[in-house]
Amino acid sequence: MSKIPPALLSEAIQNVLKDRKERKFKESIDLQVNLKNYDPQKDKRFSGSVRLPHVCRPRMTVCLLCDLVHEDIAKKNDVPTMNQEELKKLNKNKKLVKKMCNQYDAFLCSESIIKTVPRLVGPHMHRVGKFPTVCAQNESLPDKVLELQSTVKFQLKKVLCLGTCVGHVDMTEDQVRQNVVMAINFLVSLLKKNWQNLKSAYIKSTMGKSQRIY
């Protein structure tokens, strides 16, 4: 059960959407959360991902590391690819792997070659949090891309503040609300004492002011 006051959330979302201006890029809406009574040194550091009801990052670029069959499917769906031969050419070269990782926001990988990826590219993808998600050939590739564009991750590191994208300013108030509520409820479920560990929460657009929701 969410403890976010509905009226406060509604007002915050309206303020975020009202403040948007015509820009050359689509502003994202971020959820920013501060925790309390948590010790990152002693308490278990959590990490978890959840798929939100609506696509929050439509501009997220996804590349498929693929076998030859999957390559044809990807081309028909305008999904960028790198096949095994192209991956072999990287030859675990740090600079080249880094360049590939910087070029795309996320990666998918054909089920048939997932086990060879660490051998071909080394540990860098894992290190930067971009190790590919498996995509079986019987799964719809466009759906898998949408899934990545709708999924957010929470990971506690050394500081007690967390943030993630939960939408963009072209969404409706209702779509933003559904995404925010699901994201915050999921985060709370990862916390040791649930809502008791939540100090405050805000939403803000890229260029807008922070709006407190908790």
UniProtKB/Swiss-Prot annotation:
<dbReference type="Pfam" id="PF00687">
    <property type="entry name" value="Ribosomal_L1"/>
</dbReference>
<keyword id="KW-0689">Ribosomal protein</keyword>
<dbReference type="InterPro" id="IPR023674">
    <property type="entry name" value="Ribosomal_uL1-like"/>
</dbReference>
<dbReference type="InterPro" id="IPR028364">
    <property type="entry name" value="Ribosomal_uL1/biogenesis"/>
</dbReference>
<keyword id="KW-0687">Ribonucleoprotein</keyword>
<protein>
    <recommendedName>
        <fullName>Large ribosomal subunit protein uL1</fullName>
    </recommendedName>
</protein>
<dbReference type="GO" id="GO:0005737">
    <property type="term" value="C:cytoplasm"/>
</dbReference>
<dbReference type="InterPro" id="IPR016095">
    <property type="entry name" value="Ribosomal_uL1_3-a/b-sand"/>
</dbReference>
<dbReference type="GO" id="GO:0015934">
    <property type="term" value="C:large ribosomal subunit"/>
</dbReference>
<comment type="similarity">
    <text>Belongs to the universal ribosomal protein uL1 family.</text>
</comment>
<dbReference type="InterPro" id="IPR050257">
    <property type="entry name" value="eL8/uL1-like"/>
</dbReference>
<dbReference type="GO" id="GO:0006412">
    <property type="term" value="P:translation"/>
</dbReference>
<dbReference type="InterPro" id="IPR002143">
    <property type="entry name" value="Ribosomal_uL1"/>
</dbReference>
<dbReference type="InterPro" id="IPR023673">
    <property type="entry name" value="Ribosomal_uL1_CS"/>
</dbReference>
<dbReference type="GO" id="GO:0042301">
    <property type="term" value="F:phosphate ion binding"/>
</dbReference>
<dbReference type="GO" id="GO:0003735">
    <property type="term" value="F:structural constituent of ribosome"/>
</dbReference>
<dbReference type="GO" id="GO:0005730">
    <property type="term" value="C:nucleolus"/>
</dbReference>
<dbReference type="GO" id="GO:0003723">
    <property type="term" value="F:RNA binding"/>
</dbReference>
<dbReference type="GO" id="GO:0005840">
    <property type="term" value="C:ribosome"/>
</dbReference>
